[in-house]
Amino acid sequence: MFVAMNKGILISILVLPFYLQSCSAPSTIQKSEIICGAEQLEKLLPLIREKNVALLVNQTSVVGLTHLVDTLLTYNIKVKKIFAPEHGFRGSADAGEHVRDSIDEKTKIKIISLYGDKKKPSTDDLKNIDVVVFDVQDVGARFYTFISTLHYLLEACAENNKQLIVLDRPNPNGWYVDGPVLKKEFQSFVGVDPIP
């Protein structure tokens, strides 16, 4: 668990680590088991049970073949809102297409877009929410907007004294880091942080 202070506001960020079984020798290939944060329900559920929960999720937010929203609802978790990144909650929007606020047809939960005119949850969006859970697969490329959406979600949670739980998913390109660090004058939504 990481605890960060931001202007006197304490936020807790829980990164549920994945377990990767390493090979015993370079010449021997063994099966690796990856357990994502969302699959560790025994750790997640006690942190969100009896709380009003908002989720920032998309089509990659699955536990097995079941979406995290559906999994949490099965456990009677009070999911009150869904925040949608680029491509939308169900992944049906094209790259660069504005995502609109809506109601999810399956669950009837309100979806608030964080891709379009609005990039950051407002105080009103977080009203009556106790904890926000972030679970989105990223590919580790700076220009992917999911890390920018997480950046602004972190700010909003800190500013509104809301707990944020970040569920870890392994980066498929995590072994390779390359490129210059972003210069501040080029900062934008497709490059919000000074990373390679």
Which ranges hold each PLM region?
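Bacterial Sec-dependent N-terminal signal peptides
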Residues: 1-31
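A short helix->loop->beta-strand "cap" motif at the edges of active sites that frequently abuts
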Residues: 77, 159-163
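Short internal beta-strands
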Residues: 80-88
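Glycine-rich, charge-decorated loop segments at or immediately adjacent to ligand/cofactor-binding or catalytic sites
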Residues: 91-96, 165-187
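Glycine-rich oxoanion-binding loops at beta->alpha junctions
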Residues: 99-129, 141
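Glycine/threonine-rich flexible loop motifs
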Residues: 138-150
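Acidic, His- and aromatic-enriched active-site or binding-groove loops in soluble protein domains
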Residues: 184-196
